[in-house]
Amino acid sequence: MKVFVDTNVVMEMLDSRNEADLIGSIFDWLDNHEIKTYLSVGSFYTITYLSERLLHKQGLTRPQLTGKLRELLIGIIDEFQISSIGSKELLKGVSDEQFTDLEDSYQLQSASYADCDILITINTKDFKDCTDSQIKIYSPRLFFKEFIEE
């Protein structure tokens, strides 16, 4: 099994939102079972930007902010494989009329490029019309229920 994680799932955990504990349990399970887990390079850029804003809101300033951000991002790089797509996949994503949110289309293309079986996202409704894909779409709660919960 190969699992692709949408940006919103990582940010849910980093920002300690509603499903942070559940997502932490999923990440622990994936790690303990040595399941390859992927992020898109676009997600990494977005996580960098949003994490910097979060750290700033917590009162950190440079250079401490930059040091903490680097530490966080190195941890993410250690835990995830990074899927980077090229112009062919981007064009396919831009052209996919099943999506009204093109960023989600790029995420699906990144997951497909990495040969992932599963995509975990908080916004499953954004993927409801992607019938051409072999990738199964799960919310964190559904993934936990189907794979982890006894």
Show which residues each predicted segment covers.
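Short, well-structured N-terminal submotif of metal-dependent ribonuclease cores
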Residues: 1-39, 57-64, 148-150
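Acidic, PIN/NYN-like endoribonuclease modules and their adjacent C-terminal/linker elements
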Residues: 2, 109-150
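Alpha-helix/helix-capping structural signal
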Residues: 8-9, 42, 125, 142
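Short, flexible helix/strand-to-coil boundary loops that buttress conserved ligand/catalytic motifs
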Residues: 14-15, 51, 131
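Short amphipathic alpha-helical segments and helix-helix/interface helices
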Residues: 23-28, 70-73, 107-108
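Helix-adjacent hinge/juxtasegments
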Residues: 53-85
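Active-site neighborhoods of divalent-metal-dependent phosphate/nucleic-acid chemistry enzymes
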Residues: 78-124
